[in-house]
């Protein structure tokens, strides 16, 4: 019993010794209570204000094209034909699951009637490119507009058959929805 009491006492003493702070020089010999010296103020140069001169010479940017190209999201030649031949579409007929084909790959799209901003909630699964950002949609006339999560249009589609919509993304990629 005495040996176990002595061993326990020795263990307590060793444990308490490990909790004490000791200084052996080197890192511990510095006075840690002393604050660092304050920084000295430096002179600040004066600030001047004035009007900038107008740009000289030709503009560094090329002139915008006036014909031959459509603005992003605007109807291109084939889309104009699709718009005039498009079938009528209602929001209710769009609700549900759609199979999307775009840029040679397929994915799923889900459309609901839950309001989200200026459109209705929607989303994609397994899509690539611009369609990954799809967050809402709306029907505008005979056109179905897919929008990103900020409400910006990313694709426009037209009803071409009973359960089929065709169109393109703003980047020009063809998109088809079918059931």
Curated annotation (Swiss-Prot):
Residues 32-72 are annotated as: Disordered. It is found in: Cell outer membrane. A lipid is attached at residue 19 (N-palmitoyl cysteine). It comes from the Bacteria. A lipid is attached at residue 19 (S-diacylglycerol cysteine). InterPro entries: Inh/Omp19, OM_lipoprot_Omp19_bac, Protease_inh_b-brl_dom. One of its GO terms (molecular function) is endopeptidase inhibitor activity. Residues 1-18 form the signal peptide. GO terms for cellular component: cell outer membrane. Its main location: membrane. Residues 62-72 have a biased composition (Low complexity). It is a lipid-anchor. Keywords: Cell outer membrane, Lipoprotein, Membrane, Palmitate, Signal. Belongs to the rhizobiaceae omp19 lipoprotein family. This is Outer membrane lipoprotein omp19 homolog. It comes from Rhizobium meliloti (strain 1021) (Ensifer meliloti).
